[in-house]
Amino acid sequence: MVGWGVLILLMVLWLPRQAYAMHIMEGYLPLGWCLFWAALCLPALILGTRSLQKQVGDNLRMKLVLALSAAFAFVLSALKLPSVTGSSSHPTGVGLGAVLFGPMAMSVVGCIILLFQALLLAHGGITTLGANTFSMAVVGPTVSYVVFRIFQKSGFGRGVAVFLAAALGDLSTYLTTSLQLALAFPAPIGGVASSFWKFASIFAVTQVPLAVSEGLLTVIMVNWVMKYSPEVLSRAMNLPEEGHHEA
């Protein structure tokens, strides 16, 4: 685990200090919308806190896997790639935690990640924390969890279910962000729908391949956790320790 910590620290130090990626930056949304999205996040954060206490408790191995999931999401969501018109896109990394601990637990982890990124990396913002939390830490993990359960129960291998969960969770985050921006800034002609299409197309060029890449990375991480501590993965995913699906 020490090696992973050193790697993550080096990646964080390498990250650019000015980021205007898929996180909505400070001061960009009107105050009313900031309060609206923050209010929508509160139920998920309350339920998520209870979920984490119930799942993790004093179990050291569960704490390590939770920390790994948080570090994975922090590093991936802090990376940025140039998109069209001067914007940028990035992975979210929340699929791993959503699969292992559920969407409500990941809402708390994601909110903390976004807060640290806003304070340390100028990535996102404090006033827009609610909006960014709703898209990346509420909607994204929820979609990832639902997709994973559907494909898992449909008899697909663990690898396929995890890949689709992470990739579609990533895409749902960027679609939610596009909707948030469209609602706040409707186009003079075409209104919210036209504005949504504009914002979504800005992200789509880079976000689709990023979602595929994130899906593959998440599968690798799940397989690594399975080798490191299969009982933790089985418990987190509510699977029996024997007879689980293989990738």
Swiss-Prot record:
Pathway: Cofactor biosynthesis; adenosylcobalamin biosynthesis. Part of the energy-coupling factor (ECF) transporter complex CbiMNOQ involved in cobalt import. InterPro entries: CbiM, CbiM/NikMN. One of its GO terms (molecular function) is cobalt ion transmembrane transporter activity. Pfam families: CbiM. Forms an energy-coupling factor (ECF) transporter complex composed of an ATP-binding protein (A component, CbiO), a transmembrane protein (T component, CbiQ) and 2 possible substrate-capture proteins (S components, CbiM and CbiN) of unknown stoichimetry. Coiled coil: none annotated. Belongs to the CbiM family. It comes from the Bacteria. GO terms for biological process: cobalamin biosynthetic process. It is found in: Cell membrane. It comes from Kyrpidia tusciae (strain DSM 2912 / NBRC 15312 / T2) (Bacillus tusciae). Residues 1-21 form the signal peptide. The gene is cbiM. The chain crosses the membrane at residues 27-47, 64-84, 96-116, 119-139, 159-179, 181-201, 202-222. It is a multi-pass membrane protein. This is Cobalt transport protein CbiM. Keywords: Cell membrane, Cobalamin biosynthesis, Cobalt, Cobalt transport, Ion transport, Membrane, Signal, Transmembrane, Transmembrane helix, Transport. One of its GO terms (cellular component) is ATP-binding cassette (ABC) transporter complex.
